[in-house]
Structure formats: C-alpha cells, structure tokens
C-alpha cells in the first residue's frame, strides 16, 4: 500500500538537550527520519531546543523551531504550521511524553493532526506498567511478579509478601530515572518516594528482582500490514540489574542456544504484533541461565538507544524505515539503501561481532558513587566491529579514551587481591579490568561467575586475552606471535607496554613481517549481496574487501564517545565538514567510533571507517587511503591530541599547523606568545612540581585558577583558595597531563566573553561575541551565554576584535579558532585559545547565519575568505537575542557536586531565541529546568563571601512578591541588615525540600565537593527532587530580571528560517 494520501506536512518532535539516558542516539534517529520523510516528498517541520545537533539545521528539516517542546509552545506551532501528522516516536522519552499530553489534552483532535506511527493506545499500553502487564498476561508472555503503586504503603505491602531484593521502575521515564534495587524497607521507601516524583503520571512498578539472569534484547520492526522482522539480537555482558545503557552489549547474541534464540525471537514478534506498534521497537528479556525460563522486562514503543546501536551494528537504517512506515509504506515497498537491491523486508545477517562499551563521566566527578545499577550513569558509548569477541572487545576498550589500550591498567595492577575481589563483587565502571586482573592472579572462573553472574563464555574469552598477554610477555615477538596477538585485537601500544618497548618499535616490526590490517564492509547481509555504501571496519589475517581509488580525498577525524566537555557539538562540526568536502568535489572519509551520531551514519561521508581514534588506527587508514591530508580541527580534543604523533609520521595536517596548535595547547608556550604580542593575560606562571606551585602562590596570593595542559571541558581546572587545596590539586593534575606544565593564574573576578572566528591567516572573520552571565571562574560550557553581548563598551569590543586578529595571524590559523576573555574595569584579558572547532560553533552558526564549518573547510583547502565573499572583522550583530543555557544530568549521579566552577559538568545545552533579550533568557531558563514561578517560596543559603550581594537580592525577591526563607547564618546576616525573612535550620530545609515546600533554592557553596556537608546535601536534594537550584548569584539575578519583565504570552514563536531572513535583511541593509 502506498503512503497516506492525506499526509503532506509532518511535525517531528526532537528529543531536546543531551542528558544521561537520552543522548545523541535520538538526534541520529531524528535526523534520519527527517531526511527519510523529505525523500517521500513531504514537508517537514521540526521542534527541538538543542542547538548543538545537526538536526536543528535548516538542511535537515524544511522548517525548524528551536523552541522548548512544551504543550503550550507546540500547540502554537501546530496552529501556525497546520501539519497533517505528528511523529513523536523518534524524539526519545521527551517526544513520547509530549505526544501523550497533546493527545490527552485534546490538542491533536482540535487541529485534526494525526499521530503517525505507533498509536496512542499502543504507547499507553507499552509505557503504562499496569496496562503492559495485563497485555503480556493476555498473550501468555511471562512477566515478573510485580505491582504498580502510587504510594509507599502499597510498595511495602508487596515487599512483605514477596521479600527482597525488589526492582523499582517509574512509568514514563528514561535511562532508569528514579529507579533502583531495594534490599530493605529503608531503601524501598527512599527509591519509591523519589520514583513517584520522577514519573510523569506518579506511578512506579515494584517487581521481584531477576538480578543475575541474562539480559537479552531484540530490535523488532512492524508495518501496518502486520509484517514483522527482527533486525538484531543483543546480549548484555552484565546480567539483569545493570541498566542496558550502562552495560557492555554484544551483537549478535553469543551465549544462547538455537532453541533459546528462536524462543525469544518468536516472543518478540508476538509482543510487537499484540501491541500493534508501527515502526521500530526494542524488547528486553530476562533469561534464566539455568533453564529456558524467561520474563519480559520491558518494551520501548519507540526508537531507542538500542535502536541506534542495532542500526550501526547491522547497517539496517531503523529510524529511516520507521519514518516511512509511519506515513503508510510497507516493509516490502522500502528499499534497503545499503545493498540498493533488497527491500527493508529482510532480516540482517552479521558475519562479525559488535561490542558496545559505555563511557562514564567519573573522570569529572571524583566524589560520585561509581557503582552501576538500574539507573543509567553513562554519558555516551563506543562501538567496535571485529571478527571475534576478544578483538571486538579490545577495540572498544581502546576507543573509550580512558588511557586503556588493553585490559591492563597500572592502578588496578597495584591493588591487593582483596581489593580486586571487592571490585568484581559489585557492578561498577572498572569491573571489566578487575575481572581481567583476577584472571591474571588465577582466581577461578567458577568463583568469578558465581560472584558476578557474568556468563562463563564471556569469562573464558577474557581468559584468552590474559593468556595472550602471558604469551607476549614470555616469548620473543616472532611473526607467529605478533600475527596471533593482532588477530586477537591487541594494539601495538599494548604489545609494546607488555614487552617494555616503544609503540613505534612494534609498528616497525609489524611492517617488517608484512602484518597489515585488512578492511571489511558492513553490508547487512553477511556478503550475500554486494554493498553500495562504504561502511568499513578493520581486522587481521583475512582478505581485504576495500578498493582504493586514486582520487582527491580528505580524512576527517571524529570526536569519539560523548562525554562531559566533548558532546555532539563536535559531531555537528564533523558532519558539516564532510558535507563541505562533498560540495568542494573532494571525497570525504570519516574515522569515528560512536554509534549514536550522525557522522557514523553510512551515507554522511563518502567512506566511513568505524574504528578507534588512536594513532595506530588512524595511521593504518592514512597509509591505505593516501589522502590529500587529515583534518583534526573538528574532532575536539580527541583529534587535537593525535596531531603530534600524526605529524611525526609524515601525515599532512590540513588547516592550522601542529606547531601553532602546540603553542596554544601548551600553557607555557602560549603565555610567552601573549607577552610577545603585548596582549593582557591574568598574572600567572607555570609549575611542574608542588614546590614550583608553592613559590607561585606566594607571589600571586589566593584565590588562584589552576589548570593542566592538553585537556578539554576544563578537566581538572579548579579555583583554589588555600595552600593545602593547591598542593592536593598539583598532585592530581600531574596524573592528568604528566610532564606538561600546570598554569597557575591570579583569579580575575570579571565578566567572561568568548568568540569563535574563522581565519585564513590574513583575514579574520568574527561572526559574533558571546557574553557569559556568570563571572569568570565558571566554565564556559556551564555558563549561560548571550549573543549579541549586551554589556561591552565599544572600546572593549574593539580590543576583543584586535586581540583575536593578532592571535589568529601570529598562529597563522587556517580554519576555526575559539578565544575566551575576561573583562574587568575596562581591561580585556585573554584566558584561553583553542585553534579548533569549539562547542559554541553550532549555536553561533545558527544564531548568525554564518556557515562557519564550511568556511573553515574551504580555508583549510587553500581558499581565502575574500574569495568566499567575507571580510575581516565583526559580522553585523542580529536584531534578535540568542541565549545558550547549560543542561545538567546531576540527578543520575549520586554524590556528585552540583555547584558551578571552572571544571565543566553539563552534559548538554539548549537555546532560547526571541526578538527580546528577556524573552530569549526566559525560554533558556525554562528549557534548562530553571523556570521560577511568578509567586512562591524561595530558600536562601548563601556563603559568607557572597553576603554583600544578598540584601539587594532579597529586596528584589520581596518586591516581586516571593516569600523568603533563609538558613541560620544567612538569616542572621539579613537580620543585622534590618531585613526580615523566615529563618530555618539546614536540616529542616532539606526535609521541607523533599516535601515540595519550596519553589526554588539559591545556594552558593562554602567549600563544595564534600558529600557529608549539609550544604552539599541541600544542593543534592534540590536536584534529586527537581526543584530549580541556583548556585551562582549572577544566574539568579538574570533569571529574576527575565521573570519580572517578560510577558509569557508575548514571546515570539518564529522558526529559525524566519530569524535567518530577518538577519539577511539586516546584513543587507548594514552592508548597503
């Protein structure tokens, strides 16, 4: 049956900012869906408030609204755009929950908008725990003993009957938000009370724990004619009890018998048919390792994290096919774009093993509980493809960028055996390495299996890796041993470390023995049909399937897994670079290993190498492809950190040279350059030892800002206030960047400003200047940023332009550059320079209409900006305002400090755009979860250093009609100032917070980072109970200003296309 005749315009709901549990996989699927609908001749309208994604570029959808996906806003867009249908199953939980609300509030019926794909009833059945259980029982599919509760009493009653442990799963949430495993009444009360608050409908499922059973997933697809296929089976390395997003996942399943596989495959098809899901769906099972007994854990009636993994694992474009099914096409009417011959009505076959490993943010949060369970904590993930599980696993490990090139880690090696055994007894981010070390120490596999419940098949594979390590260690590196090690997935660096030699020695020996990788294609059909797309992975000892053509081509190095400090902004830049190369008539090659992103879609570049981004892997591809050169400026710190090794091996870097990159990344060299250029910088010096640091501190006095070299996201950057804090810091920083200088600056309490520019070495174009709401000292990625800057004098603006031009020319920048400044009392200081794409490139490109990445690619290929129609200086500023707001995932990270500082903590960002500044800021606050009601109760607990700012703040709050509560010390100070507020103890404040008594909390930390401190507990409680929390006086002042001045009904709801037209007219008039 052809597509629906009455659907011509479709509204797609995006998933919003990157948060733990809802990351780039939804941008990938949403982008694919928009392209898929446009292929069918439909007009696509998109709503998504995430500026960092390629999805919100006007190249992807026809009309783009960067607005908050709320019922109120989306109703206005529906009224304005009059879509025929709405597609919500590709926007993660955000899209699904919004669709449910629009349907329940009668908005879809009011405007005659059809819910496309999976029906409202099917969504309700899959998402509502009670209805889902009933449906499974109807069709004879087993579900664990459980009860849906709306209060704590019913949960306790169930526990009394069935005993512990129990698993708690809130309804309509993602990433296991608010869930957990309870082992006693106290834990049950705590988890259930939180879960009820996190659930959109105030209900949670309490079920008997199946902890230790195998967790198996099936990705299934169904069309409206009831045609069904299973796309991929996946097996979690970790047993039930660890969220699948925090588990190592392998595809296809490795330890199931054919009977077990067919049993679960049949159940999957039965379930998707019973739920009448139209499109893709993910089904999770718990399988008893001792029998054929299984239970259905849950169904996601939408494209999910696992769908993105299954898509990349098989090459089957799930989101693309799901979008076409949503508009009425059947599976046998949709062409498989990978083979170009078969239809989408076939089940992919894999002749390789895929391994996904999560990337956790614990390098940013040292105080956080590193245990993993039912609530997801990973920010991103990597995927590897190889011919065996061992090789696939080792490839994935070295893709993580955690300084692991195999399963041997020095800090684990140094542990006592009892510490290792403790480490394997509880799921945590390091357990894989603890198990390998236990095997090295001859701990019995049966014992490890008993403790971890990880299948012995996997443990024996880990033992194979450990035995190979022993073989390498004991023998000469003969051709036979080196071949065997490479076939098993060992990196040159790991082999070198085991043998105590250099990586280049292993590389040279490998070449002497003619041991080179072979490259294979992912074709969805185990080579049964020829593939027309170029989706490639490496292996050893097999036939090479990849032909090399002598044509102009360029390699773009991607940014790897999503982590704090390096998010999808860099994937946006990589994708734009691939498109710019295509427009320039040059074949583009991307190297990346992130299954969630658009850059690793099979048709984004001309050729995709799904490989680790390490020196060895990149050099192998470079030597095979022989391109014009390599672009490192779009892959964040991942790509930048490879530059030195690439240049030493004769690789041509396109864009800014390695020498210039090194000057800007090395704190000592950079400081000298600024002195030569006569550019202001904070007073400071660089230290290599604790003694150096003490001497500098004596000269500069506290507070100081300290940071290592060659890191991203302000990793390990801190403001220190005492000598002891400084000494502790230096010891830690020398581990982060060994042998590299630590910069110690006098802290400047000024406004922070940043620019992104494009330079060709002579001409420097600055699209705009962004001003941060928070003072210097809060990481730029965690600051609210305003464009155009509002509080700079003409003289300060001219100085910023002049400094940017001087630095860009001195470094001979050919491409993008990002510079951060502090401005205090009319003096402009340069804080930092990054000669690469930064996380603000996507938002500045969207705000100003300047195609920054395209220009950077053209410049790197040798063009001049003047030839491209641009001149030096500041681009005309827009007549509208854009505000970037950070978005945090703190509620998922137990014991993480939530207050702002120099080290970045946000996982994503949203954008507020409006014709007025207050309107843009109000939208940004709302999108970031910091919306303050017009009236209500506000709690203040302020650090002494900020006391002088409190009286004016309280007067403002009282004038706006808020009822003020303060903790003892803050209240006492206000009383001395003659200001009366309600005073309560910190302990009582925390209790009232849990009861939902306060509408917002303003708390500036005294020390921070100590989970035992009451202030720390106060901040954590606010975050966990979703009460707006402000830890910076600057943010709350700006927020109150917006609340006081904004007329919510007067906010402009315009598409980015309309804003672009406003700016085009503005530029035209100014140029004339």
Swiss-Prot record:
Keywords: Amino-acid biosynthesis, Arginine biosynthesis, ATP-binding, Ligase, Magnesium, Manganese, Metal-binding, Nucleotide-binding, Pyrimidine biosynthesis, Repeat. It catalyses: hydrogencarbonate + L-glutamine + 2 ATP + H2O = carbamoyl phosphate + L-glutamate + 2 ADP + phosphate + 2 H(+). Residues 930-1072 are annotated as: Allosteric domain. GO terms for cellular component: cytoplasm. Residues 402-544 are annotated as: Oligomerization domain. Binds 4 Mg(2+) or Mn(2+) ions per subunit. Mg(2+) 1 binds at residues 284, 298. One of its GO terms (biological process) is glutamine metabolic process. Residues 545-929 are annotated as: Carbamoyl phosphate synthetic domain. Mg(2+) 3 binds at residues 820, 832. This is Carbamoyl phosphate synthase large chain. It comes from Thermoanaerobacter sp. (strain X514).
